[in-house]
Amino acid sequence: MEYKIIKNDTEYNLDDLTKLLNTSYWAKDRKKETVKKTVENSLCYFVYDTDKNKLIGFARAITDYTTNYYICDVIVDEEYRGEGIGKKLVETLINDEELIHLRALLITKDAKKFYEKFGFYNKEDVMQKDKK
């Protein structure tokens, strides 16, 4: 299977991306309008199965392009997991010329071992305020 990663794909299918994100525990109820707005305000990476022209992965970064960036919504279609696509997706994101010299942040409850392979480490001084 061949796949390609496209940065800031302007021709992505909003329905396909929403469906993919809705398969995750963190975005299972995310509305299409919200997905559209997050894409518009983020640096995004779309992964496509080139044989089927199907969206199979996605990740995005929120940044000021000066100090930090926050990685979020990293997902690979369940059917394609275990093939190294997530690894390649994260490598592409963290090695992006616009981000490589910035501090990367992320929040995960189940993928810590995965991100440690890229140099991420646990930091206990994170605070959160939930939305209303």
Where are these regions (language model features)?
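Short amphipathic alpha-helix that is part of the acyltransferase structural core
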Residues: 1-32, 126
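A conserved beta-strand-loop-helix scaffold within acyl/acetyltransferase catalytic domains
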Residues: 39-51, 56-74
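Conserved acetyl-CoA pyrophosphate-binding loop and the N-cap/start of the following alpha-helix
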Residues: 80-89
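Conserved active-site alpha-helix within GNAT-family acetyltransferase domains
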Residues: 102-132
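Residue-level recognition of the GNAT/N-acetyltransferase active site
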Residues: 77
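Conserved acyl-CoA
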Residues: 88-104, 113
